[in-house]
């Protein structure tokens, strides 16, 4: 019946883990199929895979599946498995006893809660239970009760695809074949035939077509359609090849699940090919396709958006797809599209503080808030929904016009570490979970006291597209600033991919730039920047110390990262090459502790410019070759006869200690180096 209707359904088995698994085994023996089993514990001989490896299933298909959530619920893995199952499939979801489930520790919370032990996740579990019970197409079998008897409503028989393009696919293929240059971005929900269409394009194209994506396994469906005409490349390997060879004879580059590839890498690849087809999922395990359109595609000069709406792997109104969408809020990133700013000059915009307890009592608020975040940040995934609903230390504000959410702000508590632990973070010896900015200021900017202070980091901020450029984000931030100050916090912070536009925005909000990383972020292709808004005297002192350190060090940092000087820094024209107290502390941390070279780079550069006698007494070949002569680590390792990079780092530290001893008696060091051994 289900196969005839083209539908898939969910059966929830709730009870003890052993009972649930035994029922799943029994049912799998009664129904022939592939029976993909996702969980940390699966029966011997099962076609099983752990939740953390579920992405390897992408691009594949199977009949029937089991998802074991008795110990923890990995929502991304559940979404992946649901997308893999074809028409006629049952998905068996194994969960703890129904009434106990929300109270039990969830092992998956270790991935996103920033806690040292699993926590219970009552808000998300109650939300999920509510969706499961509300669906007439979900069957619940609880231990100690009789199994449900599935009742299927009469529906017309489904006509599965016969291998030829659907009307929708054919129209898109014709459009693609007529194109001479540009980038086409194909978005669709799972099961709509994106990969199949890409394979058809390869099969019909007269020229060479190359394929790339986050993993070769994910292109299985595409390859089946394209045969041996599609050559697969890993993204980084393809870029390296393009940089060294002529690829002008390649007509098409096909990028599967493009939103999963770092934007800088994707941009670099597109420059080498006249035509490119990028496919990405509208909503799912990797994030949102709509956000991908807003963020990445807006940077392209010649791109075209195309979409597939009709499913081909199952029939329309599929029960399994609908319940997964309801649980993950996959359909809620469009809910703000109809909000018009007409009359906004007189519209009353209210800033509302939201707590996690509000999400269950006001499901519409949750849908609007999370939907807005999903549409604005294309790497928003189901993991973020789990964190938003149950992770400790989360704070939220919503900008509302009447009952509509037009702005969303998400903040995370940071700091409060013990002094000894903060020193260990500074020394490079410890890196506990959480406190992203606070720990980074200690580990990379020398501000060891940052993790001790109480702070709150802005994690996400989003404003509905039609309501932007009206100061709504600044209103929300100002409200949270007052709230945090009233609670006795020391500072607010933010981490962002550095662009002039974003730097100016945060500066206008009162934040001061205090750190710029030495490497570009994979997600944004920009250097990671951090800014602080002080709220207390201690926060003022930290902010000023970190800002002045960045200004003083900028001469050497800029040579390392090649970034234009931020307008808010105003560094001196000539670098300060004297060694001050902060430099000696930094050098001691590098020489006698485990601070990374990148964090100590300006102090090391100053060290190398000291007394000329130092060059005779301590030539420091490893440091000089790397910092002054621009040699690669591989070249230095070979030149000095070292065993590898680890030995080179040890050599760097030894040379730093040697130079310090020559310039300043060890007994007079400002830092007791014994603390760092």
UniProtKB/Swiss-Prot annotation:
It comes from the Bacteria. GO terms for molecular function: 18S rRNA cytidine N-acetyltransferase activity; ATP binding; tRNA binding; tRNA N4-acetyltransferase activity. One of its GO terms (biological process) is tRNA wobble cytosine modification. Its EC number is 2.3.1.193. The keyword Cytoplasm applies. CDD domains: NAT_SF. It catalyses: cytidine(34) in elongator tRNA(Met) + acetyl-CoA + ATP + H2O = N(4)-acetylcytidine(34) in elongator tRNA(Met) + ADP + phosphate + CoA + H(+). Acetyl-CoA binds at residues 461-463, 501. Keywords: Acyltransferase, ATP-binding, Cytoplasm, Nucleotide-binding, RNA-binding, Transferase, tRNA processing, tRNA-binding. Residues 351-533 form the N-acetyltransferase domain. GO terms for cellular component: cytoplasm. ATP binds at residues 169, 191-200, 313. Its main location: cytoplasm. It is found in: Cytoplasm. Pfam families: GNAT_acetyltr_2, NAT10_TcmA_helicase, tRNA_bind_3. Catalyzes the formation of N(4)-acetylcytidine (ac(4)C) at the wobble position of tRNA(Met), by using acetyl-CoA as an acetyl donor and ATP (or GTP). Belongs to the RNA cytidine acetyltransferase family. TmcA subfamily. This is tRNA(Met) cytidine acetyltransferase TmcA. It comes from Yersinia enterocolitica serotype O:8 / biotype 1B (strain NCTC 13174 / 8081).
């Amino acid at each position: 019946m289900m196969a005839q209707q083209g539908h898939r359904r969910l059966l929830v088995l709730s009870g003890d883990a052993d009972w649930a698994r035994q029922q799943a085994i029994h049912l799998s023996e009664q129904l022939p199929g592939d029976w993909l089993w996702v969980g940390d514990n699966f029966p011997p001989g099962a076609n099983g895979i752990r939740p953390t490896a579920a992405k390897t299933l992408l691009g594949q298909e199977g009949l029937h599946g089991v998802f074991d959530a008795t110990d923890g619920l990995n929502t991304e893995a559940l979404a992946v498995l649901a997308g893999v199952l074809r028409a006629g499939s049952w998905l068996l979801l194994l969960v703890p006893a129904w009434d106990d489930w929300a109270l039990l520790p969830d092992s998956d919370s270790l991935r996103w809660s920033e806690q040292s032990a699993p926590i219970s996740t009552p808000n998300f579990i109650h939300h999920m239970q509510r969706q499961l019970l509300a669906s007439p197409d979900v069957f619940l079998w609880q231990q100690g009760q009789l199994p449900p008897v599935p009742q299927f409503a009469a529906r017309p028989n489904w006509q599965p695809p016969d291998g030829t393009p659907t009307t929708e696919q054919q129209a898109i293929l014709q459009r693609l074949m007529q194109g001479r240059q540009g980038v086409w971005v194909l978005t669709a929900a799972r099961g709509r035939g994106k990969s199949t269409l890409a394979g058809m394009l390869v099969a019909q194209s007269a020229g060479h077509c190359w394929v790339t994506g986050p993993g070769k396994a994910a292109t299985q469906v595409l390859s089946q359609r394209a045969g041996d005409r599609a050559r697969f490349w890993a993204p980084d390997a393809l870029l390296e090849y393009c940089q060294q060879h002529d690829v002008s004879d390649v007509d098409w580059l096909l990028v599967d699940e493009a939103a999963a590839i770092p934007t800088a890498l994707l941009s670099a690849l597109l420059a080498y090919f006249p035509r490119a087809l990028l496919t990405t999922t509208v909503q799912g395990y990797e994030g949102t396709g709509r956000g991908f359109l807003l963020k990445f595609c807006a940077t392209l000069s010649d791109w075209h958006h195309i979409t597939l709406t009709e499913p081909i792997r199952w029939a329309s109104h599929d029960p399994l797809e609908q319940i997964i969408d309801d649980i993950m809020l996959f359909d809620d990133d469009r809910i703000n599209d109809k909000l018009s700013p007409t009359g906004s000059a007189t519209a009353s915009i209210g800033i509302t503080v939201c707590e996690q307890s509000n999400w269950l009592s006001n499901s519409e608020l949750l849908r609007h808030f999370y939907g807005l975040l999903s549409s604005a940040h294309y790497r928003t995934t189901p993991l973020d929904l789990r964190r938003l609903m149950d992770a400790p230390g989360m704070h939220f504000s919503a900008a509302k016009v009447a009952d509509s959410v037009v702005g969303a702000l998400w903040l995370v508590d940071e700091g409060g570490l013990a002094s000894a632990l903060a020193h260990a973070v500074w020394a490079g010896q410890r890196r506990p979970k959480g406190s992203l900015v606070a720990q980074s200021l200690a580990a990379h900017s020398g501000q060891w006291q940052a993790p001790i202070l109480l702070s709150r980091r802005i994690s996400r901020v989003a404003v509905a597209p039609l309501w932007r450029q009206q100061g709504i984000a600044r209103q929300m931030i100002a409200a949270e600033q007052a709230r945090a100050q009233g609670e006795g916090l020391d500072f607010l912070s933010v981490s962002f991919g550095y662009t002039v536009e974003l730097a100016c925005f945060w500066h206008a909000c009162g934040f001061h730039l205090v750190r710029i990383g030495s490497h570009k972020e994979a997600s944004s292709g920009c250097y990671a920047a951090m800014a602080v808004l002080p709220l207390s005297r201690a926060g003022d002192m930290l902010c000023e110390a970190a800002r002045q350190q960045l200004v003083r060090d900028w001469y050497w940092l800029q040579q390392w990262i090649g970034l234009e000087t931020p307008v808010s820094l105003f560094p001196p024209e000539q670098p300060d090459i004297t060694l001050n107290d902060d430099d000696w502390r930094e050098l001691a941390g590098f020489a006698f502790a485990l601070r990374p070279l990148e964090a100590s780079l300006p102090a090391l550069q100053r060290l190398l410019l000291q007394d000329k006698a130092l060059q005779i007494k301590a030539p420091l070949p490893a440091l000089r070759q790397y910092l002054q002569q621009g040699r690669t680590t591989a070249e230095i390792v070979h030149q000095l006869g070292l065993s590898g990079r680890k030995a080179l780092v040890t050599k760097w530290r030894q040379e730093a200690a040697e130079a310090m001893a020559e310039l300043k008696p060890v007994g007079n060091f400002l830092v007791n180096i014994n603390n760092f051994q």
